[in-house]
C-alpha cells in the first residue's frame, strides 16, 4: 500500500510578485494533498540575509529566477521525492546539505524556502489540519496585533522621509476583527487628512499600501497620524499606538560615520536623543532598526535607555539568523526580533530563530517583505508561534490584505479560544 504522506512530485515555476518582479512558486504533491508556496522579496535587505538567486542578463532586467526554479526541479526535487512530507526538519536539513553554503547562495534561499513552505502546506493538507495548527499544535491560539504601515518613507517611497515606516497598532481592540476595522477606518481618514493638506497626488500608495506624502521631517507623519486617529474616533496611545521602522542602515553615511535625517547629521548619541524626544512626545511603543546593522553598540544603548517602555526590534541587525540573535541576546542589543522567513530560508530555521528569541524574553514580530504575493503563510505562522504581532502593510493592496483576511478566517475558526493580546503584544502570556 502506498504511503499517503510520501512526496510524489515537486514543481517550481517563475511567477510575479506585487512589484511585478519574478519570484519562485513551488508545489509539493503527495497521493492525497498538494501544498503551494510563493516566496517574497525585500527592497531594504540586510547584508547578512540568505541569498536570493537572480539570473542577471537582460531578461526581466536581470531579476529572473529561472536558475532557482531549475535548482528546485533538477536538484532538490529528485532528493526529496519519496520522503515523508511530515519530515519537515529532515527535508529542510537535507536542502541545507545540498546547498552547502552559509548563506544558501548555491541553490538560492528563494528555491529552498519555496520548497520548505510548500512541504509544510502539503503536510498540513494531508493531515486535514489548518497550517497554523500543523506548525503550532493545539496551543496556537494567540492572534497577532497588526503593525500597519500606513505612511511610507525611505526606500519604500519616493518622498524625502528618511524613516521607512510609520505604523499604527490597534492595542486597545478586543479582537483581531475589531483591530483590523480600526486600522481600516483610520487609514481612510488618513487618506482624507493627507489629501486636504498635501493634495491629490499625495495619496498614491507605496509598495506596502501606505501613503507616501511629500514629507521630510520625521514629526510630520506622526502629527498627521494623531489627527487621523482622533478624527476616526479613537484615542492615540490608549487605543491606537505608533510603531516606527527607521531602517537606519539606509540613512547611515559609512564614510562619515554619521546618520543623516532630514538633511541633518547625527552621531549615535544625538540620534538616541532624537528617539528619546519622539518617544516622549508621541505614543510610540516599538522602534525597529533604530541604528544600522553593524551598530551593536547603538542598539545596546537604546535598549538600556528606552527598552523598558519601548520594544526595540532588530531586523537588519538580526536578519532572522540564530547566530546574530544569540549575539544580540548576550550583548543586550534590542529586545525583539523581526521574523522574516526568507531572510533565513527554511521554516525550521525560522521557527528556531523565534524560539531562541522567546526563551531570552524577546518579542517576535512576524513580517512580510515589500515584494509580496497572494501567499498568506505568514498569517498562519504568526498564530502558530503565538507571536502576538504581525507586520504586513496597510489595509490596501491584495498582497497585504491576503494576510489580514486569512487572520480573520483563523480567528473565526478559533472562536471562543482565540486571544487578542492588545497592549500585551510583546509577551501575550504575561
Curated annotation (Swiss-Prot):
(2R)-2-phosphoglycerate binds at residues 164, 340, 369-370, 391. It is an enzyme of class 4 (lyase). It is found in: Cytoplasm; Secreted; Cell surface. InterPro entries: Enolase (IPR000941), Enolase-like_C_sf (IPR036849), Enolase-like_N (IPR029017), Enolase_C (IPR020810), Enolase_CS (IPR020809), Enolase_N (IPR020811). Disulfide bonds: none annotated. Catalyzes the reversible conversion of 2-phosphoglycerate (2-PG) into phosphoenolpyruvate (PEP). It is essential for the degradation of carbohydrates via glycolysis. It comes from the Archaea. Its EC number is 4.2.1.11. Binds a second Mg(2+) ion via substrate during catalysis. GO terms for molecular function: magnesium ion binding; phosphopyruvate hydratase activity. One of its GO terms (cellular component) is extracellular region. This is Enolase. Belongs to the enolase family. Pfam families: Enolase_C, Enolase_N. Its cofactor is Mg(2+). The active site is at 208 (proton donor), 340 (proton acceptor). The keyword Cell cycle does not apply. Pathway: Carbohydrate degradation; glycolysis; pyruvate from D-glyceraldehyde 3-phosphate: step 4/5. GO terms for biological process: glycolytic process. The gene is eno. Keywords: Cytoplasm, Glycolysis, Lyase, Magnesium, Metal-binding, Secreted. Mg(2+) binds at residues 245, 288, 315. It catalyses: (2R)-2-phosphoglycerate = phosphoenolpyruvate + H2O. The keyword Cytoplasm applies. It comes from Thermococcus kodakarensis (strain ATCC BAA-918 / JCM 12380 / KOD1).
